[in-house]
């Protein structure tokens, strides 16, 4: 990922989410600013790996990110809405896990934080070997997420 990708990621992935869950315009502007700052810091961090996926026309398809926490990494995958329901998610998740683990052999567990309403995402992670053990967490955005875990060999 490079700095030029930051605004593309926001427009293609986060804007709809922000508009859905945060109705106040000042909140939306603050989230946009925080988004830009977060990515600028994290693209050069050793604790984060961010992968951007494009199609053959160089259109933005998806992003996968990994946050390393000792022997566990949090994984997030975001798919451009125009590429959903076309079979991309499973392939992107699998490919990004492979890339991530090549450089992070000390990681023993992967965690995915998924909104309860996001049935499609839950299926994708379950198909990739993640399990849900009734563990939930309220994250910094104030929303409650179900935690799916995959134990690695």
Outline where the language-model segments fall:
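Short loop/turn motifs at secondary-structure junctions and domain boundaries
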Residues: 40-46
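Acyl-donor (CoA/ACP) binding surface of acyl/acetyltransferases
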Residues: 1-6, 11-15, 50-153
């Amino acid at each position: 990922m490079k700095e030029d990708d930051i605004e593309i990621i926001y427009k293609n992935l986060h804007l709809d989410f922000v508009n859905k869950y945060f109705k106040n315009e000042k909140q939306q502007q603050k989230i946009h600013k925080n988004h830009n700052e977060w990515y600028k810091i994290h693209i050069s961090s050793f604790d984060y790996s961010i992968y951007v996926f494009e199609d053959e026309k160089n259109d933005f398809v998806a992003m996968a990110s990994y946050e390393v926490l000792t022997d566990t990494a949090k994984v997030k995958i975001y798919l451009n809405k125009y590429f959903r329901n076309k079979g991309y998610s499973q392939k992107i998740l699998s490919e990004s896990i492979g890339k991530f683990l090549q450089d992070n052999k000390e990681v023993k567990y992967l965690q995915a934080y998924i909104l309860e309403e996001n049935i499609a995402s839950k299926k994708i992670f379950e198909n990739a070997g993640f399990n849900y053990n009734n563990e939930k967490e309220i994250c910094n955005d104030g929303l409650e997420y179900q935690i799916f875990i995959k134990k690695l060999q």
